[in-house]
Amino acid sequence: MRIRKLIWILAGCCLLSGCRSGNANLSEKNVSDTEVTEESAESRKETEQDFPQRIQEDVSENVHIDAECVYPENFQEGKGLKAVQSGSTLWEQREQIVDKFAKGNPVLDVEETSYDDFQSESYTLTETTGISITSENVLNYFSDQATHILNTIMEDDRFDSYNGNEFQTTTDLAFISQEEAWNQIKSFLQEIGVEVTDAYTCYVMDYKTMQQEEEKMYQLLQEEDTKTFEKKEQWSADDDSYYFKTSIAWNGYPVIPYMSGEGNDEQNVSVVYDKSGIISMMIIGHYPMQEKEEVDIESPVKVAELLAEPLNNIISDTTYEIQKLTLCQVVIGKNHETGMAEIVPCWKCSVQVKNDQEDPGYTTYYYYNAETLESIS
């Protein structure tokens, strides 16, 4: 009996010892897991600080940052995609594109232009419509009707004649909704291999407002002794149309064409659409792209700090507010021998500039290589 009791006591001690050992291991594991969780949380916190949704800072009396940070869909913090040109360009598929705009009808005339590394072809489709495509991948489809419509609007708010807001007081026209018109335009663009962002600007061109604004524009040009345009004889509901402006995109990135000089418009696709369909289309600098590799990119926080410094060194009463930082792809050059474009991920910085308190201001843009933070001009 004593031996049996001794065995049970020893067995109990072993079990207790094992439990304590197990609890000790479990406790160590919990501590380790807690440390990992805390490290992960800290890492996430640092990442969120580096790649926030918004940056706000008063750098000085004249320089402020209140910037929305815009990332592509499925963006991974600290990572960006590097792309290379791949596929058929607008110039290479110009014959198929012209056929689509001609809608099966024969082309009336073709005019070819060539000098140095530049080529273009202009096609007369009807008495009132035509299309030109260049080796720089610029497409311009135009019509007399679209010209009359575009004569009534100045959408650049840097000019005193700006009236874009007059065409943004309503959303839909009677002949088709804005959304359906946009879907049809987007479908057509996809057919010719052009991807665009849904972040578009739309001007609702109703005939009454166009008639009113056409007269204002005409009078303004006469007062400035500038060559005027030919006014439309009569306006009616048949002239109602939508004027869309958007940007070329790739994998969710806005794509900025090759830049040369002041006044580059980030919205490099514009379309006028009426009850007959597309009556005007301009595409500037489209390059088909495919992914080359994933790269590390700098944070928008660093970009904002980098841009704020030279702005702060400007000695004037002008104020600068950095309002948006958008991760894009930008074409920084083109090899004319191969026809291939050089493309890099970049941060596009939108800055509002005001010369005084009463000045409505205007927006200017700065571009930085997202990998190296080198300025792109």
Provide a role label for each language-model segment:
Residues 362-377:
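C-terminal soluble interaction/assembly domains
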